[in-house]
Amino acid sequence: MSNSMRDLISGEAELDDEEEDESFDERGGQRRHKNAVEDSSEEEEDDDDEEEARKVREGFIVDEDEDEDEGGESDADVRPLHKRKREHRDREEEAQLDEDDLDLIGEQFGERPKPTTQSKFKRLKRGTRDEDRGNQRRGLDDIFSDEEDDAGEQRAYNNRSSYRQADEFDDFIEEDFPDDPEELEQQREDAEVARPRDRVIGNIADTANLDKDALDDMEAIFGNGEDYDWALQMEEEEEDREREEQAIELKDVFEPSQLKEKLLTDEDNEIRFTDEPERFQIDRKTFKSLQLTAEQFKEEARWITNQLWPKKGLASDLQSPFGKAVGKVLEFFIVDEVEVPYVFQHRKDYLLHTRKTRNPNRDDPDAPEYVISADKLLNQDDLWKILELDIKFRSFVDKRNALEKTVDNLKGMEIHDAMVDEMIPEATTMEELQDLQDYLHFQYGQQLKDLAALAGNLSLTKRPGSKSNLLERVRQGKAYGFVRAYGISADQLAKNALRHGKKVTPDDDAQYPMDLADSLIDDVFSTGDQVISAARQMYSEELFASPRMRKHFRNSYYQAAEISCRRTEKGLRRIDDSHPYYEIKYLQNQAIADLVHQPELFLKMMKAEEEGLVTIKLDMPARYDFRQHLYQEFESENFSDRAEQWREERKKVLDLAYPKLEKIIAKNVKEVIRTFCQDEVLKMCREEYAKRLDQAPYKPKGMILGTTPRVLVLSNGMSDPARDPICWAWVEEDGRVIEQGKLGNLARDERQREEFEELVKRRRPDVIGVSGWSAETTKLVRDLEGLVNEKGLMGPEFEDPDTNDYRTEPLEVVVVNDEVARLYKDSPRALAEHPSLNPITRYCVALARYMQNPMKEYAALGKDVSSLSYHPCQNLLPADKLAKYLDSAMVDMVNLCGVDINEAMNDTYTANLLPYVSGLGPRKATSVIKAINANGGAVGTRDELVGDPDSGKLPVVGPRVWNNCASFLFIEYEATNPSSDPLDNTRVHPEDYELGRKMAADALELDEEDVKGETDENGPGAIVRKLFKMDEQDKVNELVLEEYAEQLERNYSQRKRATLETIRAELQAPYEELRRNFALLSASEIFTMFTGETKHTLCEGMIVPVNVRVVKDDFAIVKLDCGIEGRVEGHEVSHRSSIKEVLSSGQTSQAKILDINYKDFMAKLSMREDALRIPYKRPINLGRDGWDYVLEAADKEELREKDKTTGRTQRVVKHPNFKPFNGLQAEEYLGSQPNGEVVIRPSSKGNDHLAVTWKVADGVFQHIDVLEMQKETEFAVGKLLRVGGKYTYTDLDELIVEHVKAMARKVEELMRHDKYQNRSRGETEKWLTTYIDANPNRSTYAFCIDTKHPGYFWLCFKASRAAKVIALPVRAIPQGFELKGYQYPDMRALCNGFKLRYQNEFSKMGQR
């Protein structure tokens, strides 16, 4: 394996822990088998020696991704190159086995192999290394042995089985692969040399009891084996040559899933090395072969314009320029292959519509004659939308091409359908194309099957169903005469409804309907009633399949349909007042136009319908009279008894077709609205993420925006800063943690206060950051602010712009957004970067880095950025679309700021930005880093990126990708380096360098001769260097750019007005910080961060549980579950009794919120009985027609009556995770939630128990029994909560965090492991068998989930092709994993522990 390839592969990562638990016996910690289906594995753990020995005999394991170099075999040996060679090797292996080995195999395979009597000779290579290799193997064997084996020779001859074990287990523990190809080859040779050779062993074993004469006779008869050494040597030399020529590839070492995860598949490499922007390749992968014609390109521009224009709200006279701008942007994307940042930065003039008008201010002689006004046609979001619509249009054209091909094939069979020919060019949506496709399959199904049969596509020639047969019999029989008698075709009826052309009125048949039906009787339909029934069915199907009729329905529904929700029986009890879906439970009569302005509401409706909680109804309002309108279009103009009967017949056939059309159109409309609403919420998420990214580093007063500050950060985590240690970290500008430590109580301990003062004065930070994940952090914030003021701790000096004097201000204490730090503190990245720091200190480090550059911290999260909260309903969005939208926001911001390419080579945090640079992506970013490293590890100029043969520089990127990324990768200007170009440190694209140089020359007032002389002597960048050296950049402001821009457009057809302005700005301030100032959190944001509550989840009128802390004569201080304090006045407790008679310290009671001060984390509460009797009702302002108040009241009464009948007193626990569910309901509720989500619910075991249900994986839920102890009242939560008689917690939050969430992290760690298979146990065993069949000389193992026993996984392993698959239960526990009674903290320890355990067992068996 080459070094370059090895660098692409990281070692086994230490992933976050995530585990699950099970229910235990309360006294002994043993599993309760009576409830095993729900909470335990039911797997008996038998430690019997014979059982273990049997399992060991069935096979041992070596990772399938480890090289099989032992035994002289390489991957080349595994392949069946020559049958003779394989037989030769097989005989060698058999010859190495002694009697004990054969007995062992015989027990496993059911028979004993025949002994081998023939031996082969092999040439030894590098024999001098035998001794060393033997020592290595002996060391591994002796790990498990107390005795020292002194006789190496004896071990070689008489203990061959131990060699066999060493071969198999040599690389059993996961190790890195050699970096050096020579080292890899050396190891292969070592393995061959170290293997005990059968010829030596065989000779000694077979001739030990023979005397010399006998040996001479045997040699005379059979020879000594040397006669044919030359042939064997030639054969082995040929094998060696083939082995050397066949290089090891990544796919020989890693599984496809691993290569895919690491972006190292052949497809990834193709993307990596293709000279096209990576994001374009991925987006257009499906339509790689689709080439748009010039006419289709124009059509696409019109199609996208029509999609975007209605939402822009621009003046009507800008519609034509808007369409041209869209067309030009498409040209940039498709023809020039440049990405959004490039277009926005370097083609900005094409996104504007400029007007040149005569200056109205003619009185001012110095005023210009003309003024320029500009209208912004497209913004950056529009460019991303155009790119998205381009993919949709390609999908549309691809489907239309397939449809046209089908029509052409039918025309080849002399089938012409004018309606299809007319409607295909008119179609503008995928739905309309699908309607046409459905119509073709309905109308010409048999012909299409014949075409498919001719083409050999047997999948389309399956036997038609009974419905198709019926319709075909009607179509080909006499009954179709009745269909014609309806007077007009289904398509013509649709035309009438759509008002297309002149209305055609149906003619009534000369006979009455029944008489006509009787006349059409045949062998298929033997009665008139059958004829009428079949004809109705046929015509209704024709109406249902009519593309025009569907279009009429669809248009009408979009225009006038109203949407209502109806709760199901399941949703009646599930959706209670606190349920997130309550706001849609009784929603009714909502116009589509209104719902699209509340996208969250409709997404909740669709999700609730998927969960079976509600049904969504789309109805045409009665005032619209939609069905009656259709009746009228189908009526004849005749008046008679016969005409009336035909009118009734037509009405019946419409009534038959209407529900079918209504159902399919309603489904289609709902999906279209869902997609629209998803796009709207995705847009909101993107905007919110962009807002967080659009923050420059924190700027202390007097510093230039963009300067990185030195930060001191403190945090108390979840603890009380008055009682528990406060962690702090000091982080320099470059992100290094220089110093860290702990402090005590800063409010009262003077010694600690002085220590803090000394720290600040010694380190002189630019700012103090603070954060935490509890409401107690507010105390720390107040303590720090008080300390700064009391001790006079000042920030850095800065120049006062008013007085020009230097002064200082008190050091600012900033509460920092900690959403990134919370993910970082326990991540594998944090553990790798700061293994010696505790989680809270690592949290402080992340907070400091966030203040130094928020964008880099978000980029470092990678895929985890999707787990942050941007919108309350983001869980209702497709995960892949959300990730793509978030990535687009990062792309915008990274390219706005640019990336110092040389800094990226030395700093991983900066390198994390490279995938978001225009033209690049995760694959190309790694390629860029490796190529630059190959070129010496640094970039001198932007031109070097496309290669420089003269200086031996290899190309880093291709020309097209370079064109995309060049201006966004900057190189700091070095005045002392003559080859350094100042423009390489700007946002100016190399294609515009000549413009920049000309502007510099004009600013310096140099003529052409001066410019030529300067450039001839010092190179093309000399003029700009001179401008910088003379510090004359401000002179570019004196240039009149308008005339120059007009000249460029007139002479070269280049629109560069905005580009010239960019060049002017960059010459004055290269890559100036354009992000907004660091955003300080608002009071409500701080409240949410510290408490987890929002103004919607904790507000006035809510009834919450509170814990009484202090009781005075006229008030009480209480604490809410979220951690904030509350005050209850005496008159808000009771009018009749003293407050001390009602309340006592430590008591838990219910209280109603009267007012909340979100800034001070204080609430005013009432405990009066009359106030508590009025429940909180979420405000719903939908009007009487928009909410079904009658059904709501009836449902509440029904539930009350049911509770009275059952006599059930529902227990209520005031906790955000508590739900009044049973186990099944909890599983249904958690079904749509992410893994690890928790529901606390009443227990069927009584009021001294609670049940906790959490989602282990999709369809797998664990139910945990929690015993409550030290309960104050029957319904109060116990002060001690015990799980399984083994784990004890003091409150529900601790139980969730330390028990359930800890297990969830372990489960996630296991499921993200390379060895995890997202399959059932049976499928995993099949996979192992298939893998071993393909790799017969390997052993392997895998993990899979045990769906029958939540919280358990199977460790399945297979030692060889003939061995059975053995499965061992692995249990997730809060501290790690448990296997066979042993606990392991993480997956690496679990895997290695498993291997060591079975290696040990096998070694012991070998010794016996």
Swiss-Prot record:
Sorted UniProt keywords: Chromosome, Nucleus, SH2 domain, Transcription
Protein family per UniProt: Belongs to the SPT6 family.
Purpose of the protein: Histone H3-H4 chaperone that plays a role in maintenance of chromatin structure during RNA polymerase II transcription elongation thereby repressing transcription initiation from cryptic promoters. Mediates the reassembly of nucleosomes onto the promoters of at least a selected set of genes during repression; the nucleosome reassembly is essential for transcriptional repression. Essential for viability.
Name of the gene: SPT6
Native source organism of the sequence: Gibberella zeae (strain ATCC MYA-4620 / CBS 123657 / FGSC 9075 / NRRL 31084 / PH-1)
GO annotation, biological process: nucleosome organization; transcription elongation-coupled chromatin remodeling
Compositional bias ranges of the Basic and acidic residues kind: 127-141, 185-199
Protein name in UniProt: Transcription elongation factor SPT6
SMART domains: SH2
Domain S1 motif: 1101-1168
Residue span(s) of domain SH2: 1213-1314
Biased composition (Acidic residues): 13-24, 39-51, 61-75, 95-104, 168-184
GO annotations of cellular component type: transcription elongation factor complex
